[in-house]
């Protein structure tokens, strides 16, 4: 069995070096690496060549900037593997990943699979805090690969794979936000098997800039409404929770201002719960302290994006703006 590792890249030379270093260190090397440079102004071709000379099977392609979905499709068209495996360029892969993946597929031959993401010990405390909030049940409901989840598992392209047979029938990714959720939905609709392999995590470097993190989760919230327009039955209660949290927080703040500070108690208890849970999970006071603002940004960004998109696309009836989505995704 040959795996084709497909990675879209945009101006991430240092991250690509770390990714290729981790792939070179794999215990099992039954894979090729297909790097697709999506119009970067700082290309990583020299890094790819360096690791190819070390013996890693790396194929490097440069194309005009059109967005990561088109870049992934470009890679799949040129890949030779039986399975396509997708990582983000800011991921680092544990040494036993492919050895474990082979075993998992032998025991449970899924058509499409995904794995969780985690924080490496070398990551900054901010990255670890964001990783915690992006994977915690308290802030996500477990929908990003947690063992306890409020909805069916949906693979994400930071750690996702599917067979060539899936690709032949379903086709490639659409150029849209949350394209991995859209892809997983189409795969499921075609009757293919989808599941979570908890044994194959990746180490995912999170954004260390709070503004960029806000923008990222804000777009996640907006894209959930786009998915609802495409798949009317896909919106679940768990997806609405950040928006409910934003509305509830604003209401409690107003009540605290005009009536009594006691209305802040529910907010305080929730943030304390996040701090305590993060402290137990990470064993670090610093990470636990940073997890509190990370959770506020995550829920606030997602919730406001969700509310904004719901109002404009559903209440005002404007629907999807495909051209805007494509333009926003270029160079991301």
Walk through the language-model features, giving the residues of each:
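Cell-envelope/extracellular polymer assembly enzymes that use nucleotide-activated donors
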Residues: 2-4, 32, 182
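Short, acidic, metal-binding catalytic loop of nucleotide-sugar glycosyltransferases
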Residues: 21-30
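Glycine-rich, basic loop-to-helix element that forms the pyrophosphate-binding segment
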Residues: 44, 63-79, 100, 150, ...
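Short aromatic/hydrophobic "clamp" motif used to bind/position activated sugar donors
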Residues: 84
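Conserved donor NDP-sugar-binding/catalytic core segment of glycosyltransferases
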Residues: 95-128, 200-201, 205
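Catalytic donor/gating beta->alpha subdomain of glycosyltransferases that bind UDP-sugars
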Residues: 174-235
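Membrane-embedded multi-pass helical conduit in multi-pass membrane proteins
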Residues: 245-316
């Amino acid at each position: 069995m040959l795996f084709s590792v497909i990675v879209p890249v945009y101006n991430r030379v240092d991250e690509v070096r770390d990714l290729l270093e981790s792939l070179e260190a794999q215990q099992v090397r039954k894979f090729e690496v297909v790097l697709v440079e999506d119009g970067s102004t700082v290309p990583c071709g020299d890094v790819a060549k360096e690791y190819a000379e070390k013996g890693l099977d790396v194929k490097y392609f440069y194309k005009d900037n059109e967005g990561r979905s088109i870049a992934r499709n470009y890679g799949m068209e040129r890949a030779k593997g039986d399975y396509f495996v997708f990582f983000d360029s800011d991921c680092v892969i544990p040494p036993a990943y492919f050895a474990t993946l082979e075993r998992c597929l032998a025991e449970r031959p899924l058509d499409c699979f995904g794995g969780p993401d985690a924080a490496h010990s070398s990551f900054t405390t901010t990255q670890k805090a964001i990783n915690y909030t992006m994977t915690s049940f308290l802030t996500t409901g477990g929908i990003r690969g947690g063992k306890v989840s409020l909805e069916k598992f949906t693979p994400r392209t930071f750690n996702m794979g599917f067979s060539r047979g899936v690709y032949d029938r379903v086709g490639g990714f659409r150029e849209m936000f949350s394209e991995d959720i859209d892809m997983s939905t189409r795969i499921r609709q075609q009757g293919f098997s989808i599941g979570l392999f908890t044994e194959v995590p990746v180490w995912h470097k999170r954004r260390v800039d709070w503004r960029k993190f806000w923008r990222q989760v804000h777009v996640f919230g907006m894209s959930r409404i786009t998915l609802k327009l495409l798949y009317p039955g896909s919106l679940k209660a768990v997806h609405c929770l950040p928006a409910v949290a934003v509305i509830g927080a604003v209401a409690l703040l107003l009540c605290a201002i005009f009536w009594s500070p006691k209305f802040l108690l529910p907010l305080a208890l929730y943030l304390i719960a996040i701090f305590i849970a993060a402290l137990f999970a990470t064993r670090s006071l610093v990470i636990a302290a940073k997890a509190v603002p990370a959770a506020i940004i995550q829920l606030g960004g997602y919730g406001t994006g969700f509310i904004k998109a719901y109002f404009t696309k559903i209440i005002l009836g404007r629907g999807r703006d495909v051209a805007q989505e494509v333009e926003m995704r270029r160079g991301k």
